[in-house]
Amino acid sequence: HMAGFDATAVGGFGKEHFQNFDVGAMQGFKADHLGNFTSDAIGGIGMDHMKAFDPSAMAGFGKDQFGAMAASMMGAFDTEKIMNFDPTAMGGFDMEKMAAFDPNAVGGFGKDHMAAFDPSAMGGFNMEHMAAFDPNAMGGFDKSHMAGFDATAVGGFSMDHMKAFDPSAVGGFGKDHMAAFDPA
């Protein structure tokens, strides 16, 4: 189901949409902040869409490289599919478990595409914006909470990169930017 996935792009999205991400903040959400995270709120993808998810295509990690991570933190992944999760490592994966991973990129993000991300924030959202965090909403943010949305704090993306932001779309990106994404 990953036929339209562009390995050289950021998470399948064109490089032009991800100019200001910082490699130093790769993990984004700290483990202790994920307590209220629900699998049905991951990037707006419902569980019914996760059935077609191919763990072997996840950011270049092979399915045999997944294992001890809590299923509640990974949504569609069972504990048996996430063997070597290391919360202290980059993105939760130990470097020696990243054989199928592109050494010149971090989670699919090229090092040269990562600059203005706020490492002290959660997934790009400053703590004051997290007060409105709703684990049952798309990506954790309900439309009614988007009033406090700070485009410059989201993954460090500048306003220019946030033009196409659509809170009702998958992962916040408009359908016209989801061309390479196949949820089914």
What are these regions (language model features)?
Residues 1-184:
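General marker for long, soluble alpha-helical cores
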